[in-house]
Amino acid sequence: MQLTVKALQGRDCSLQVPEDELVSTLKQLVSEKLNVPVRQQRLLFKGKALADGKRLSDYSIGPNSKLNLVVKPLEKVLLEEGTGRRLADSPPPQVWQLISKVLARHFSAADASRVLEQLQRDYERSLSRLTLDDIERLAGRFLHPEVTETMEKGFSK
């Protein structure tokens, strides 16, 4: 379907996307067309802000719809990220997009959406439960993989 995204400064772009596309994917496309970083974007449809993890169809966005783009000042984005949530809390939207595509091959659109939402909740819960010791162990494995391999070989004998 064809969508028009109009920034408050007057610039706009037309995009061709499927009706069940993720908002995060749409933001990536808008970023490429209008050169507005994803993290500075806030998309609105009929005055309502669109959430990254939702699909366009969740908001009844149909063909030829017009979305408004509010560009958040970089200072505000950095402040929100610093106080509201850590940058590493969530994988890049591309990861969720790829997972969504895999799920779409095996489930109906509604079921795939529910599975993806549950996976995202589980991911966030797992991250929030990591202790500093867990993080230190993970960092050690990434920084010194040869030590981990040696230890694993020692245990397998």
UniProtKB/Swiss-Prot annotation:
GO molecular function, one term: protein-folding chaperone binding
Region Required and sufficient for interaction with BAG6: start-end pairs: 96-138
Keyword terms, alphabetized: Cytoplasm, Isopeptide bond, Nucleus, Phosphoprotein, Transport, Ubl conjugation
Post-translational modification: Polyubiquitinated. Ubiquitination by AMFR and deubiquitination by USP13 may regulate the interaction between the BAG6/BAT complex and SGTA and therefore may regulate client proteins fate.
Ubiquitin-like domain residues: 1-76
Entry keyword Ubl conjugation: yes
Disulfide bridge partners, by residue number: none
GO biological process: post-translational protein targeting to endoplasmic reticulum membrane; regulation of protein stability; tail-anchored membrane protein insertion into ER membrane; ubiquitin-dependent protein catabolic process
Cross-link (Glycyl lysine isopeptide (Lys-Gly) (interchain with G-Cter in ubiquitin)): 48
Residues with PTM Phosphoserine: 90
Pfam families reported for this sequence: Tugs (PF17840), ubiquitin (PF00240)
GO cellular component, one term: BAT3 complex
Subunit structure: Component of the BAG6/BAT3 complex, at least composed of BAG6, UBL4A and GET4/TRC35. Interacts with BAG6; the interaction is direct and required for UBL4A protein stability. Interacts with USP13; may be indirect via BAG6.
Role played: As part of a cytosolic protein quality control complex, the BAG6/BAT3 complex, maintains misfolded and hydrophobic patches-containing proteins in a soluble state and participates in their proper delivery to the endoplasmic reticulum or alternatively can promote their sorting to the proteasome where they undergo degradation. The BAG6/BAT3 complex is involved in the post-translational delivery of tail-anchored/type II transmembrane proteins to the endoplasmic reticulum membrane.
Name of the protein in its database record: Ubiquitin-like protein 4A
Organism: Callithrix jacchus (White-tufted-ear marmoset)
